[in-house]
Amino acid sequence: AGMQFKEGSVVRTISKGQNVLGKATITEAFEKDFVIYDLNRFLSLHSSLSDPEIVINSDTNNLTIKSGTSKTTYGLADESMIIAPPAKEIKVENAEVNFRLTKDDMNQVLKLSGILGLPNIAVVGDGSEISISALDVKNDESDNFSIKVGETASNFKMIFNTENLKMVPGTYDVSISSKGISHFKHATDQIEYWIATEAGSKYEG
């Protein structure tokens, strides 16, 4: 997937399906806007170099990446070639479901979903507890795994695609709205995600 970098220290990206938006504030600030067409390719290059220094060349629409005595020229893309995130911030207001998801609980549910081959993760309220479960919503007889993460007086089932919850590891404060959008805010780093819930999600109150 491609990624747009804006002038400043805030980086925002959106998934190809436009159902996951990520935002992070980084320590370095970019002097100019630029677009990378294949982010994984660029990150692989960046990680293979020792202490790389990046110079943005707007006139030739490329980057010069210096590392020791080596120099790499890396071509940039046009904004029209990628799916750019919306300029407007997403707000999740009056979210009905709120809880803290610890790093250990998140890691465990993702690990078990992988071992059991389960395509969905659901946040479920049964009128007393909130649990996060790995399951297959299309198969009632599938294996499932769940962990209690909070308490609630409400009944709901908010469904996510497991792939959409593969985020930067950490503890997150989670808010989920019955309108189909959730907000995951990292507890210690300046990282946030907005993730759409899947069809079949319901909030009964």
Cite the ranges covered by each PLM segment.
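DNA polymerase processivity clamps
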Residues: 1-76, 95-205
